[in-house]
From Swiss-Prot:
GO terms for molecular function: ATP binding; ATP hydrolysis activity; ATPase-coupled phosphate ion transmembrane transporter activity. Its EC number is 7.3.2.1. GO terms for biological process: phosphate ion transmembrane transport. InterPro entries: AAA+_ATPase, ABC_transporter-like_ATP-bd, ABC_transporter-like_CS, P-loop_NTPase, PstB-like. Residues 14-253 form the ABC transporter domain. SMART domains: AAA. It comes from Prochlorococcus marinus (strain MIT 9312). GO terms for cellular component: plasma membrane. Belongs to the ABC transporter superfamily. Phosphate importer (TC 3.A.1.7) family. This is Phosphate import ATP-binding protein PstB. The complex is composed of two ATP-binding proteins (PstB), two transmembrane proteins (PstC and PstA) and a solute-binding protein (PstS). ATP binds at G46, P47, S48, G49, C50, G51, K52, S53.
Amino acid sequence: MIKTNKKTPKNIILSLENVSISYGTFEAVRNVFCNFKKGNITSLIGPSGCGKSTVLRSLNRMNDLIPNCSLKGTVLFDGTNIYDKRVDPVEVRRRIGMVFQQPNPFPKSIYENIAFGARINGFTGDMDELVESSLRKAALWDECKDKLNDSGYSLSGGQQQRLCIARTIAIEPEIILMDEPCSALDPISTLKIEETMHELKMNYTIIIVTHNMQQALRVSDMTAFFNAVEYEDGDGGKVGYLAEFNSTKKIFNSPKEKTTQEYISGKFG
C-alpha cells in the first residue's frame, strides 16, 4: 500500500483519528479517536445502535459496499491512510481480514474453502501445506483432516466458524476483525473459538465486537465501550461515540465513566 507521511508509535498497528461515519444524512458514529496495539485482542462493546459494528467494518473498508456510507477522519494502518483514493480496498481487506457473525463457508469442499482465497490472491506455494497450517491455527485440523473433500456445509456451526477463521488466516492478514463471531454458537463452540483466539494473538492483532460481557472479559486485553446519545435537534435519533477505552481489567473493575459501569452491570443495553 502507499505510504503517507503520517506516523504512529511502533506498537500501534491501527489508529482512528477523529472518525465520523454516516449513512446518507444519518450520522451513525461521531469523532472517534482510538489506537489499537499490535498483538492485542481488543473488544468493542456497547448497546445496540451505538456504532461499534459500523466502526469495525470501517477498519477494512467493508462499509464501502454499503450505498451512501461515508467516512470523515483518518484510519491509519501501517503508516497508510486506508481511505486515501490511491489505496486499493481489496489489498486492505487482504491485510485486514474479517470473520462475520454468521458462519459463511463457500459452497465448496473444506480444502477449497482455504485454497480458493489463497489462490485468487496469488499464492503459488505448497497448497497442501497452507491448508493444513491454516486449519491447525484455527484448531480444526484434527477434526477434519480425514474429510477435506467434504463440503464445508457438512461441518457443525462452530466448526464452520473456525473454517471461516482458517480461510481468513490463509491469505496472511495482519489483523483479524470479528463481528460477534460466537453469537450464533452454543457454549462449547464459543469456548473453542475463544481458545482459538488466544492462540491466534501470538501472530495476529484481533479486534472483536461482542455483546457478551463475560466473553470480552475472558478474551481481550483492551476494551472500547461505545454508547449513543440523542441528536441535538431532538428528533429521536441517536449517534454513537466512544465513551471509554482502556485495559479490559480497568474497564470492568474501575471504569472512569458512570455509563460504562451501568452498562457492564446490566442496567441498560
